[in-house]
Amino acid sequence: SDLAITPEPCVATIGFFDGVHAGHRYLIQQVKEIAAAKGLRSALVTFPVHPRKVMNVEYHPELLTTPEEKISLLADIGVDYCLMLDFTPEISRLTAREFMTQLLKERYQVKYLVIGYDHRFGHNRSEGFEDYVRYGKEIGIEVIRAKAYTSNIEIGNEPNIPVSSSLIRKLLHEGEVSLAAHCLKYEYFLDGIVVGGYQVGRKIGFPTANLRVDDPDKLIPADGVYAVWVTFDGKTYMGMLNIGVRPTIDNGPNRTIEVNILHFHSDIYDKFIRLTFVKRTRDRKSVV
C-alpha cells in the first residue's frame, strides 16, 4: 500500500529500485524473511522521481522502469508496505542520522533497517554502514547488512558480475536484451501510444506501428532490429521491431521505434501498446 506513514512497526529497506532487478528482489526477500522471523510487517521506502532529477530538472536518468511500472513490479513481489517518499530539496539536506530519526523512526516506525551491500543515503551520501549502525543504536533502529547478490553471468572475462541498474543500462545500450532480461528476471519492455510516422514500411507491404514512449526518461535500447512481443487490447502478437534514425529517408536525427506486427493488418493508431523485448536479431534494418 502507498501510505504517508506505517500504522505499525516494520522491517524496511530503502532505495530507488530502478528496474526492480534480481539484486533488488534478493534484498527485498531478505526483508520479508527478517520481518516474518520478527513477527513484523515488511516495508520498503522508495522515491517516485529520481533524487538527482529533483535537484537538477535537466537530468535525464534513463529509467529502466517508470514510477508506475516500478510500483506494479514491487506490488507483485508482495511487501506489506511500499512507501513512496517525495524527495525534496529539504530531504536532500538531511544527514543520515536526521533521515533515520525523522523519517524512518518517527514517520515509518522502522524497527529493523536492512541496507543493501553498497547503498548509501543522507546528505552527499558521505556516511557508510558503520555510521548507520551507530545512529541506529542511538535512536532504536537495528541496522542489518544485506547479503550481496551476484549473477551467474559472464561479461567479457569477468564471471559472476554483480547485478546493478547501471549494469542493466549498459547491456541495453549495447542491445544485449537477453542478458538484461537475465539480470532483471523479466523481459525488458516499453509502453506507449501508436502514432503516425514515415509509414514507409506500409508502402512496401509491411504495415508498421510507430511507438511514442510514455515517459521521456525511459531508456530505449540500442538501435537495431529485435524480436518482440506486442501486447494491446488483452492480446499478444509476435513482432519485429526496428529502433533507429531514418537514414534511408532524409538522414535526419529523429530516432524512431517502429514495429511490424506479424500476421496483423489492422490500424492501431492511438492504441496503448507494450513492446516486450525477446532478442536482438541485427544492428539495424533499412526498409527502402
What are these language model-derived features?
Residues 1-2, 83:
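Short acidic-hydrophobic, aromatic-tinged amphipathic segments that line or gate anion-handling sites
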Residues 4-66:
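N-terminal catalytic cores of NTP/NDP-binding nucleotidyl/phosphoryl-transfer enzymes
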Residues 21, 74, 113, 180, ...:
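Residue-level signal for inorganic ion chemistry
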Residues 62-70, 94-100:
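Glycine-rich, highly charged phosphate/nucleotide-binding loops
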Residues 69-83:
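A glycine-rich helix N-cap at a beta->alpha junction
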Residues 93-207, 282-285:
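Classical nucleotidyltransferase
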Residues 197-288:
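Phosphate/ribose-recognition catalytic cores of enzymes acting on nucleotide-derived substrates
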